[in-house]
Structure formats: C-alpha cells, structure tokens
Amino acid sequence: LEAELLSQNMHFSELSSGKTNQTELVALLITQGKDFVEGIENVYQKIKGSCSMLLLTEDGIIVARDKWGRTPIVIGKKEGAYAATSESSSLPNLGYEIERYVGPGEIIRLRADGMEQMRAPQEGMQVCSFLWVYYGFPVSCYEGKNVEEVRFLSGFKMGQKDESEVDCVCGIPDSGVGMALGYAEGKGVPYHRAIAKYTPTWPRSFTPANQEMRSLVAKMKLIPNRAMLQGKRLLFCDDSIVRGTQLRDNVKILYDYGAKEV
C-alpha cells in the first residue's frame, strides 16, 4: 500500500518506530474518496485485516467499524452528548449509558444532539472471540455480552461437568480469574489466590518479538504463593493459549513451589 500511494505522488510526513505511520496511511486512503463514506469504503477494500476508526471532523465524530466486525465500537449517550469507544468500560464513570453497538462496516456520524447513519451495516460478522476470553476488561460488554459474565459462566459450566478431585481452584490473573471463580462455584470448591500478578513494567507475554523476552515477561510478572500451594491438589484456569508461554512455565513453577497436583 505504501508503494502504491507513493506511485500516485502521495506524501508521507510521519514515521512510527522507523516505519510509515499507519494512521497517516489510512488517512491518505480516505482522501482518495469523494467524501468520507467513499474514502472509508476505500480503506475497507484496501486494508487486509481489520481497521475500525474514529474521525474527528468540524461537524462531529465519524465512527466506522471494520467490515467484518472483528474489533468492537460502542456508542454511549448522556444528556446533550454522545461518545464512541472500543471499550464500554470507559462509559459509566463519565456518565454515559450504552446506546448501541456499531455493526460490521457501519458508518455513523455523531453530534452532540444526535447521530446519523451514513452507511448501513453489512451482513455477517467475524467478531474476535479473544475479546471475551482474553483481551476484554471485566466490566466491558461486546455485542451485548459482558466479559466477566461470559468468563464466569464458562467456568461454572466446566466446574459442573469436571470430575477432577481438587482441593481448590485458582486463576492465572487477570483474565483467568473470572473463569476460576465460576469453576469454584460450579464445582463447590474454594477459590484461592495462589498466584499473584505484578503488573508494573511488564507487558503481555505474547507481544514481544523474540521467545527469550516472552519467557522473561511470563516468568517475572506472575509470582506464586508457596503458602497457598504447599501440598494442594490445584486446578488452575488459564486463558493464555496464544503461544503457550505461560502455561508451560507456570505448571513447572507450581510444582517447584510444593503443589501436589496441578
């Protein structure tokens, strides 16, 4: 796309980490349309993958969700104002209520006094399932489904069906905790916090480019509690299956710290 735009005498003025700024590239694709709708549709056609966007204009905010609906956008409303965000968890403390979820490929213009649909949503959706399982903040809702509720109910059903004999259930923080709490209730066993997360300075363990750094992050940010592990038959709920980095290392650490069964 960069080469294509340069061949059309387009000009890039911004760099991000030594590479063409992706926001500027998308902006140039939008300018190729006769209006915002045609320009955004051009983005939908040219970008391989997902691209949802918010455009701040003189006449309000234009909200556009990617054509497959993989990444969410929710519109909030309060008296005299509208807001758009990818995470509904950002709305309550600002006084907004969820008004609606933007559909796949849908384009909406927001003004303080109302909203205008500029492009209707298309049929079919390929929403990212990781939103509920891994990425999502517990109080966020996507497509009307609350993140923590989905995790809790998944664990609850698993706890009802699982026949493993365990002394307690634990969750790998953060997003494994909701499922572990549900499992504990469904199984009728106590929930123990046998492993804690130290979050400052450490990113998600699957994002670094090399395996050495991924392993270091996975090791350093999760700290086991020997007192809660010693001699216990533990069931851990862990959502981190992107690369399996934490799963492999954590099981070994739990045994090293005295767990009887994991």
Model-derived segments and their meaning:
Residues 2-6, 27, 44, 184, ...:
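Short, well-ordered alpha-helical packing segments
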Residues 12, 163-167, 185-192, 226-230, ...:
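Secondary-structure transition/capping motifs at alpha-helix termini
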Residues 70-71, 91-93, 116-117, 176-180, ...:
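Flexible loop/turn segments at secondary-structure boundaries
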Residues 216-262:
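PRPP/pyrophosphate-binding module of the type I phosphoribosyltransferase fold
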